[in-house]
């Protein structure tokens, strides 16, 4: 075996790679061996050899090539000193490599291993090098690397020594570092940070890119392994390599974390990127920023509510109706679930409990409430949104004292017995069945405890194919004649027959057929006996009248609002019946804090709901078992899901209902408080006819009032009432927004007039508010019957009834009556208020408004009896709107000032303001949004010195006597009348302490869609005190346009005025008089001079005034000429000045 020893000296190794390869080939040229083996040796030496290495006196490297046999070569590589490795490591001596995996070495290695075949830039020399095998970085790069790393290596070695020493010392002694050792440790940390900063500054961006690519890919691998989406910032280069090689994902400690970088770069911030989600808009809770939640395709709105602070994403259909209760309680998503389903399920009210005297049972304590309150109904695919709510809120008749068996069965049957739906059932069919009130049952027996109520509740009427939605309302309120005194057998049967005997529907029946049957009132029964305690109300409530084929949609409203004459003083037997609320009645009180969560049935007829602000003395009432009371200050009343198809005639939203204790509320009435901030979200039906809506500000003394069930009154000061989604096709004439409806307690306004063939669509409204003549002194029997007869006797509708005719007739004012007598106490005001005048064909649009606000002469001094009746009559006679009324007509009427009133008396302290407040004007069909606001703020004239009787009547006479309009009246005529200023009022008295501020405070004009921003302030300013100033304002208006250009021109010419004056001063000694003469001759040129003089007030203000008075007619053209001449002269003047 032949051995060949080749000595590689430092001089030999100092050559570059090409020379080294040539010399090695020359040395082994004579050796007969396969060239491939020799080339392997040469390439190996060339690959791992670095030029200019300092061996520090270490032995040379010996390469021995041995030839054991012919054609065979054995190559042995001897490495004498271990810290010098030319194959894998760099060097150990002064520039030796310490084997640490720092950032730049890892970056270089990642580029060398993973980017084969790709061009890159050296991290140290910034040279473009190739990463193919056999062509590595040269020795020059290694030397540069040594110089950069030297400081860091030393600091790191010292840190290790100090840390080891300190740790060893602490381990032995069991205590922390001393002050000296702590100082040493801090010094080492400082050196380490300096080395890191120095090292990082030396890494070029190209070298950092490789590191960033590796870090990002490691993060992507980690995220991919956890099932989360890829990191989106991977570069194309690393992605290509990753897709080609797919190496195992490195751990975060090796690939990312380093001891040298642990303080500067926390791994949590660098390597835990948040996964971006396309659908994640606002749902990611701020607390969970670093903890991504797995996205769910179907989980849109329900996932984030678990976190309290997670905002809900906006929904296209979610306008203002999202209930606040549902924000923090996630509900399971349902495909067909509308926004109203959750509040129904969440806030299901509990049925009334048994009398507190009855001993509660263990089963009753849990079952009833759990079913009603917290047990949501499962949604079905075909189930409309209203079906579960129908079952939930089905009212049950009051049960007898519960027995052991009745404790569980009876409520379950009443509550949970759903009615089978029919194919042709309209949306109103279930509501008819749901809320059909049952008459109170006789003292229940063991068998009657279950059967009787089930029969009454669950006997649905067969629907007809052609039933329209409005037909039922006709049948609902049809009054029945009073029944005979009930017998013992009649105690159960009679009400069931009357309630559940369905009338056969006719083919032409309108949609109101079911509602007619539901709310058909019964006449009052005879004085109640022990058995009659239950029957009589059922008779009154549930005797439906058969509908007629030609009944128009408005027929029920005619019947509904027919007023009843006041009843006789209540007797001992009447003590129970009169205040007893109708079972289908809902009372929402202002001061009941916890009632806000009561979910109203979505298909409830708005007639059946009363939301009142003040129900002070309700404690003496015997509320029906299913009344609902909602507080005024409950912010979540907005989430009350009123039925979207509610007819607005059936809703009354009132601000004040103070003394309700004596009032006999109709069961189908809705009153909503003024100060409910979220009332705007009440989803009124989009097809509501605005004629059926009355928005009133004040209903103070309701104690004696008998409200009609189908009335809507919405408060003026509900800030969000503008958002009420009234139907886009609402006829504005059908909306009555009244500002003042004060004393409802004494109103006897409901005597209907017979309709004529030519009556417009407003015929029902005529009939509604037609006052009835006063009844004879009531007898004991009349205490119950008379009001029912007056209320429930509908007038037959005519075929040609139009909608608008009645409004003309309704509000026709009557001349003031003579001093009232005892008999005149009731009749006279009704005659004045309710005798409509027939409209004329040529009446212009302003006809009603002219009549409305024409003041009446003051009435005679009122008598003691007139103290109550007169205001109700005056308040409740709304003026009808005309079809062609423009938007500005009402505003003209509104602001017509009245003469100041006399000093108020003690009685005037309360009543007078209500009278002034409650004269609403009716809107017209073409009225824009401003119509109601104009009418609302119509000021009332002050009353004469009030006497005890005049306390109520006199202002009503002044308000309600309209003058007949003329055919040629323009739209602006009323505005002239409106802004007529009033003389100052007398000094206020102690009683005026309340009235005066209400008048001043309560006259805000509501903004309309077409209203410009400046229109209301102009109207208010004109209305205040500027009618005498009108000619002055007109002149000022004429003068206003010229001063504005003057000011602008003055600003432009200010710098040039001084040189003009200087020039004038220069020319003045020569010929000032001819200048004045020329100015008089050339008037158009003088004006610019005078304007400039006007601008320079301190110089000569008096001559300016005199000249202005002389040249007033010609100033406008002069100003124009001056404007034309100004730009020419001031510019050269400015140049000369500058």
Curated annotation (Swiss-Prot):
What keyword terms does UniProt attach to this protein? Membrane, Transmembrane, Transmembrane helix
Biased amino acid composition, Polar residues: 252-263
Where does the protein end up? Answer: Membrane
The yes or no answer to whether the keyword Oxidoreductase is present is no
Q: Its gene?
A: NPIPB13
Q: Which InterPro entries match?
A: NPB13-like_MII_rpt, NPIP, NPIP_N
The UniProt entry's sequence similarity note says: Belongs to the NPIP family.
Query: Compositionally biased, Pro residues: which spans?
Result: 349-359
Q: Cellular component per GO? A: membrane
Region (Disordered) residue spans: 242-578, 747-1138
Q: Which residues cross the membrane?
A: 73-93
Q: What protein does this entry describe? A: Nuclear pore complex-interacting protein family member B13
Provide the organism lineage as a comma list. Eukaryota, Metazoa, Chordata, Craniata, Vertebrata
Q: How does it sit in the membrane?
A: Single-pass membrane protein
Record's compositionally biased regions (Basic and acidic residues) = 406-416, 448-458, 490-500, 532-542, 782-792, 824-834, 866-876, 908-918, 950-960, 992-1002
């Amino acid at each position: 075996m032949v051995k060949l020893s080749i000595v590689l000296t430092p001089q030999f190794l100092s050559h570059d790679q090409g020379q080294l390869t040539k010399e090695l080939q020359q040395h082994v040229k004579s050796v007969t061996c396969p060239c491939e083996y020799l080339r392997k040796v040469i390439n190996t030496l060339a690959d791992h050899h670095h030029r200019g290495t300092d061996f520090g006196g270490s032995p040379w490297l010996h390469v021995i090539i041995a030839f054991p046999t012919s054609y065979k070569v054995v190559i042995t590589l001897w490495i004498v000193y271990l810290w010098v490795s030319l194959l894998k490591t760099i060097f150990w001596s002064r520039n030796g490599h310490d084997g640490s995996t720092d950032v730049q070495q890892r970056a270089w290695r990642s580029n060398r291993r993973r980017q084969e075949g790709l061009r890159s830039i050296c991290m140290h020399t910034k040279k473009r090098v190739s990463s193919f095998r056999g062509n590595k970085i040269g020795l020059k790069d290694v030397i540069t690397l040594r110089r950069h790393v030297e400081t860091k290596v030393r600091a790191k070695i010292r840190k290790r020594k100090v840390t080891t020493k300190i740790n060893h010392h602490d381990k032995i002694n069991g205590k922390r570092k001393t002050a000296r050792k702590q100082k040493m440790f801090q010094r080492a940390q400082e050196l380490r940070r300096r080395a890191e900063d120095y090292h990082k500054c030396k890494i070029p961006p190209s070298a950092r890119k490789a590191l960033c690519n590796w870090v990002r890919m490691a993060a992507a691998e980690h995220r991919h392994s956890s099932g989360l989406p890829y990191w989106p910032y991977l570069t194309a280069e690393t992605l290509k390599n990753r897709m080609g090689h797919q190496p195992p994902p490195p751990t975060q400690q090796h690939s990312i974390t380093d001891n040298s970088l642990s303080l500067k770069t926390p791994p949590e911030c660098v390597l835990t990127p948040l996964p971006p989600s396309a659908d994640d808009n606002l749902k990611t809770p701020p607390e969970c920023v670093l903890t991504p939640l797995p996205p769910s395709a179907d989980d849109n709105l329900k996932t984030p509510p678990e976190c309290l602070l997670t905002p809900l994403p906006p929904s296209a259909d979610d306008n203002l109706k999202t209930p606040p209760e549902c924000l923090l309680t996630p509900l399971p998503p349902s495909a067909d679930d509308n926004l109203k389903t959750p509040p129904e399920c969440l806030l299901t009210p509990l049925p009334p409990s048994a009398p507190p005297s009855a001993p509660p049972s263990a089963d009753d304590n849990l079952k009833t409430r759990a079913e009603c309150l917290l047990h949501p109904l499962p949604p079905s695919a075909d189930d409309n949104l209203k079906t579960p709510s129908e079952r939930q809120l089905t009212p049950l008749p009051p049960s007898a004292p519960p027995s052991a068996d009745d404790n569980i069965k009876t409520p379950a049957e009443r509550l949970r017995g759903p009615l089978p739906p029919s194919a042709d059932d309209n949306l109103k069919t279930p509501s008819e069945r749901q809320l059909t009130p049952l008459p109170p049952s006789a003292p229940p027996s063991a068998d009657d405890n279950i059967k009787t109520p089930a029969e009454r509740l669950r006997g649905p009427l067969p629907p007809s194919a052609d039933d329209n939605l409005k037909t039922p309302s006709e049948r609902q309120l049809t009054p029945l004649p009073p029944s005979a005194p009930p017998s013992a057998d009649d105690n159960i049967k009679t009400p069931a027959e009357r309630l559940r005997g369905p009338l056969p529907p006719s083919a032409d029946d309108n949609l109101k057929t079911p509602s007619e049957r539901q709310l058909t009132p019964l006449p009052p029964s005879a004085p109640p006996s022990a058995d009659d305690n239950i029957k009589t109300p059922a008779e009154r409530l549930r005797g439906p009248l058969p509908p007629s084929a030609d009944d128009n949609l408005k027929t029920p409203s005619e019947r509904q609002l027919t007023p009843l004459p006041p009843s006789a003083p209540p007797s001992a037997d009447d003590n129970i019946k009169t205040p007893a609320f109708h079972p289908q009645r809902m009372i929402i009180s202002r001061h009941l804090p916890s009632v806000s969560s009561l979910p109203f049935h979505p298909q409830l007829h708005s007639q059946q709901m009363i939301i009142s602000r003040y129900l002070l003395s309700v404690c003496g009432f015997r509320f029906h078992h299913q009344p609902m009371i909602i507080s005024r200050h409950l912010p979540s009343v907005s989430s009350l899901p009123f039925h979207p198809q509610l007819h607005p005639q059936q809703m009354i939203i009132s601000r004040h209902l103070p003394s309700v204790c004596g009032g006999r509320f109709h069961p189908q009435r809705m009153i909503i408080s003024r100060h409910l901030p979220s009332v705007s979200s009440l989803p009124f039906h989009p097809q509501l006819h605005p004629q059926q809506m009355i928005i009133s500000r004040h209903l103070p003394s309701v104690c004696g009032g008998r409200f009609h069930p189908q009335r809507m009154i919405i408060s003026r000061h509900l800030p969000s009432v503008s958002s009420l989604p009234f139907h886009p096709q609402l006829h504005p004439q059908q909306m009555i927004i009244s500002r003042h409806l004060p004393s409802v307690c004494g109103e006897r306004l409901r005597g209907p007039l017979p309709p004529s063939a030519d009556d417009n669509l407003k015929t029902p409204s005529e009939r509604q508010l037609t006052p009835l003549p006063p009844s004879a002194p009531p007898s004991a029997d009349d205490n119950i019957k008379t009001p029912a007869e007056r209320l429930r006797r509908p007038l037959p509708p005519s075929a040609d009834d139009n909608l608008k005719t009645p409004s003309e007739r309704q509000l026709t004012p009557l001349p003031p009556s003579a001093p009232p007598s005892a008999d005149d106490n009731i009749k006279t005001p009704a005659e004045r208020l309710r005798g409509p005048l027939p409209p004329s064909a040529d009446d212009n649009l302003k006809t009603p408004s002219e009549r409305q606000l024409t003041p009446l002469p003051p009435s005679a001094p009122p008598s003691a009896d007139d103290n109550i009746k007169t205001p109700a009559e005056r308040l409740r006679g709304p003026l009808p709107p005309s079809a062609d009324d423009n938007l500005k007509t009402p505003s003209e009427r509104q602001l017509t000032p009245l003469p100041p009133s006399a000093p108020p008396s003690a009685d005037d302290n309360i009543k007078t303001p209500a009278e002034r407040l409650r004269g609403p004007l009716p809107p017209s069909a073409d009225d824009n949004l401003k119509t109601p606001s104009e009418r609302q703020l119509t000021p009332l004239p002050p009353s004469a010195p009030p006497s005890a009787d005049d306390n109520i009547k006199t202002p009503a006479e002044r308000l309600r006597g309209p003058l007949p309009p003329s055919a040629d009246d323009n739209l602006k005529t009323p505005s002239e009348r409106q802004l007529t200023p009033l003389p100052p009022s007398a000094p206020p008295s102690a009683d005026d302490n309340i009235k005066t501020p209400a008048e001043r405070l309560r006259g805000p004009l509501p903004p309309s869609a077409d209203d410009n921003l400046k229109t209301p302030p102009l109207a208010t300013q004109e209305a205040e005190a500027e009618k005498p100033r009108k000619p002055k304002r007109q002149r000022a208006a004429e003068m206003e346009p010229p001063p504005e250009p003057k000011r602008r021109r003055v600003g432009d010419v200010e710098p040039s005025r001084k040189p003009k004056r200087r020039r004038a001063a220069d020319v003045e000694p020569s010929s000032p008089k001819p200048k004045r003469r020329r100015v008089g001759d050339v008037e158009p040129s003088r004006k610019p001079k005078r304007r400039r003089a006007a601008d320079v007030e301190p110089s000569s203000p008096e001559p300016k005034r005199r000249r202005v008075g002389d040249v007033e007619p010609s100033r406008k053209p002069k100003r124009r000429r001056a404007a034309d001449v100004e730009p020419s002269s001031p510019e050269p003047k400015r140049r000369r000045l500058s």
